[in-house]
């Protein structure tokens, strides 16, 4: 892959990644399609929203449908009908989020969330699966510590992440895919620095900031991001794993981060909350019952062009899945539009003004929450 920083505004960067399935402008938000689909959306919905790259999950696809089924389709792109770039997570986040039977230097034995059977995953298996999936960007297999881990536990996870990164790179034998390293270190600046230096000494196509936005205070999220970015190379993309709220993304862009993913926009849509340029909007609330306004007057998505707040409120009131679909369409369109505005503002030198507005309306809870 190739990455070029075209312009900067402070630490905020306007760039472009050239990947096997196309170019991706940064800063970029990646909708999450864990099981080879973004919940409730078709690939055409994503294309119409302007999504340039999506994320899928190695661990879950390894379980169902299984690598052999995806190989029958000659890769994940054909399997899910998506022609643009894909990033696959390595399964490392599941070290933190799923029940584990055993974790040591060799790898992790999980309890399958599907049938309770034992599943073994290590750097070599993760690389083998991601190569078979054919994703444009693959992630090293890492050890993401739990939020309440003490210093020694985080240190052990950080050292293991380094050893697993070495093994991941050694096992990554492919030409058309990129491999990103993942920096760990929890909320400890010295471990963040150590991890960043270790990963950059190996050399990867890009670097992710992992193990944050998992329950720690926002101030710590931002502080640890600053510490990490300081030791990452200028000529490689930087990816904050799991950051998806508008105000957090703007804060992170201001600190030099280029890539983001989260289930946040789609998850809150399924629960009746829309993201707008004035903050969050609760479509379940009774004050929308008679509203003839669109979800967001500034939005040109299918939902906002064709339906009123009143209608979407009615759909949620009656438990109709169409309400969830329409808000998911809108929220993904909003996030893609937000990132376009971020890129324009870096280009035009107005990023600070955009950031101030977005942080203000979302940090205050927005309107009609």
Swiss-Prot record:
Residues noted as binding substrate in the record, renumbered to the chain: 89-93, 142, 184, 211
EC number per UniProt: 2.4.2.29
Cofactor requirements of the protein: Zn(2+)
Highest rank taxon of the organism: Bacteria
Biochemical pathway: tRNA modification; tRNA-queuosine biosynthesis
Region (RNA binding): 242-248, 266-270
Gene3D superfamilies (UniProt xref): Queuine tRNA-ribosyltransferase-like
GO molecular function: metal ion binding; tRNA-guanosine(34) queuine transglycosylase activity
Binding site for Zn(2+): 299, 301, 304, 330
Active site positions: 89 (proton acceptor), 261 (nucleophile)
A GO-annotated cellular component: cytosol
Keywords: Glycosyltransferase, Metal-binding, Queuosine biosynthesis, Transferase, tRNA processing, Zinc
Any GO BP annotation: queuosine biosynthetic process
EC primary class: transferase
InterPro entries for the chain: ArchSynthase1/Queuine_TRR, TGT, TGT-like_sf, tRNA_ribo_trans-like
Cofactor note: Binds 1 zinc ion per subunit.
Catalyses which reaction(s): 7-aminomethyl-7-carbaguanine + guanosine(34) in tRNA = 7-aminomethyl-7-carbaguanosine(34) in tRNA + guanine
HAMAP family cross-referenced by the UniProt entry: Q_tRNA_Tgt
Role played: Catalyzes the base-exchange of a guanine (G) residue with the queuine precursor 7-aminomethyl-7-deazaguanine (PreQ1) at position 34 (anticodon wobble position) in tRNAs with GU(N) anticodons (tRNA-Asp, -Asn, -His and -Tyr). Catalysis occurs through a double-displacement mechanism. The nucleophile active site attacks the C1' of nucleotide 34 to detach the guanine base from the RNA, forming a covalent enzyme-RNA intermediate. The proton acceptor active site deprotonates the incoming PreQ1, allowing a nucleophilic attack on the C1' of the ribose to form the product.
Stated family: Belongs to the queuine tRNA-ribosyltransferase family.
NCBIfam families assigned: Q_tRNA_tgt, tgt_general
Subunit structure: Homodimer. Within each dimer, one monomer is responsible for RNA recognition and catalysis, while the other monomer binds to the replacement base PreQ1.
Name used for this protein in its record: Queuine tRNA-ribosyltransferase
Lineage: Bacteria, Thermotogati, Thermotogota, Thermotogae, Thermotogales
